[in-house]
């Protein structure tokens, strides 16, 4: 479980970025949304110790992040940065994915097994000898996820994962998230992509001006006035609202809802 207890944070004294944030998240898929500058990335970087609270505490499976290293926490919470290139430094895809497990001190045989599983999970089997920097944007995003998967964390934090991806790349990402959910992985996804939120999220955390504006069920979230927070409703939500239906995830659900 990830527990946030009365957390405050500032980069500059007197200008808090996060103000008394409290919440708990156990499993499933949590979307973290809000306007630019609302504190989203600052908050989720606390989940694996990249940033420490100024006040309050963040506990990950009972471990206070103030008392643990990022290396220790990375076994529980993996972080995929918005720009995957920032994560890469090896010359082959295999060595890139193997880097984390090797640092854990695993045998080379177990490292190979983890790399094989992670690459298959993200659809990059056969890419082992390719140069990470020569992959497409979507392939780089999948490789970044594979690098984290190979560490076998309980939670994966994805920071704006659809940025720069075309429709095909976004579709592949959604499939990966759904498949890994079935295998027991949980996700925290920072995003402006409301279609992604509608299709995959269980819960939504809405931040604005460093404060929690909403934390709860995804369908309840889409009943809010999102324009107030400079967020764009998915077309499907607009249609549901227009005909007096509660939000649904797919066109198929919409058709069933109107009896077709």
UniProtKB/Swiss-Prot annotation:
The protein's predominant localisation is membrane
**Subcellular localization:** Cell membrane
Bilayer topology annotation: Peripheral membrane protein
What PROSITE patterns does the record tag this protein with? ABC_TRANSPORTER_1 (PS00211), ABC_TRANSPORTER_2 (PS50893)
Quick check: keyword Transmembrane in the entry?
Answer: no
Its Enzyme Commission number(s) read: 7.-.-.-
Name its species: Pyrococcus furiosus (strain ATCC 43587 / DSM 3638 / JCM 8422 / Vc1)
Tell me which UniProt keywords the record has, alphabetically.
ATP-binding, Cell membrane, Membrane, Nucleotide-binding, Translocase, Transport
Q: What is this protein called?
A: Putative ABC transporter ATP-binding protein PF0068
Which InterPro entries does this chain map to? AAA+_ATPase (IPR003593), ABC_transporter-like_ATP-bd (IPR003439), ABC_transporter-like_CS (IPR017871), ABC_transpr_CbiO/EcfA_su (IPR015856), ECF_ABC_transporter_ATP-bd (IPR050095), P-loop_NTPase (IPR027417)
Similarity comment: family membership:
Belongs to the ABC transporter superfamily.
Q: Which CDD domains match?
A: ABC_cobalt_CbiO_domain1
**ABC transporter domain segment(s):** 2-234
- Function according to Swiss-Prot or TrEMBL: Probably part of an ABC transporter complex. Responsible for energy coupling to the transport system.
The Gene Ontology CC terms held by the record are:
ATP-binding cassette (ABC) transporter complex
Write the lineage as a comma-separated list.
Archaea, Methanobacteriati, Methanobacteriota, Thermococci, Thermococcales
Enzyme type, top EC level? translocase
Q: Which residues bind ATP?
A: 34-41
Matching PANTHER family: ABC-TYPE COBALT TRANSPORT SYSTEM, ATPASE COMPONENT, HEAVY METAL TRANSPORTER
Mind listing the GO molecular function terms for this protein? ATP binding; ATP hydrolysis activity; ATPase-coupled transmembrane transporter activity
